[in-house]
Amino acid sequence: MDNPQSKLWSLQYQIKINPNVSPSISKFHQGISYYDYLKQIHQVRKPSSYFEIGVETGATLAFAQCRAVAVDPKFQFQGNPIGRRTETYLFQLKSDDFFSQHDLKKFLPDGVDFAFLDGMHHFEYLLRDFINTEKYSHKDTVVTLHDCYPVNTEIANRDMNYDHRTDVVTRIWWAGDVWKLLPILRDFRPDLDVAVLDCPPTGLVVVQGLDPNSDTLIKAYDEIIAKYRDITLENYKIEQFRTEFSTTDSRRFFQPDLLKNFLTFRI
């Protein structure tokens, strides 16, 4: 029996997504695919260290040309995700287990230059992944979050519920409720620089200005979970969400010179 989620990953990684095939997509995500944008960040920024949670096929991991650490509970590599890298550390673990068992500095002594967080699609998991990754950040670290800008409410539930979808195009998509990271970071970490790029299929969030010494989210963790656990995008209202968190045109910041102005860099 085919796995609907595997079909989704295959669709995304082949980059066959046409923003015009669904009104819900074309209206809100007309930019560069998240896949191509991540590749461009690697090529332009040339990070010296890379960290990824939620690797699965290894398609985005393959972009890294530097020392890399990758975490996924079940790797499903397609092709060679290592390439010419001399150091790649693979951990087939849940991200919580990775952070409880390992010190990321052991593998990335100078911290994380660039990170892509695309793990479990429940907001508390992404929140913990963000908290734990920020501990290894420096002033110029760039952290990207996937699936935080769903095109409709059907794909934004905690449960997949494929059988109750009405949008033909997004019927097998699942972003989960990680969209909640946007109001959480806005309310609890206004010091961060957060941009939402209109990258199909479900947006790409770029976070900069990180502070490895911040304990704000850790101290507020229980409060955050209690506040957001039972909120759905239906009762939050997707129109309100889109008003509060408008997207940035990813095409404006795709060319190397413009992308350099968008991202911070180590000198």
Model-derived regions, located:
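A short alpha-helical cap/connector motif
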Residues: 1-116, 120-267
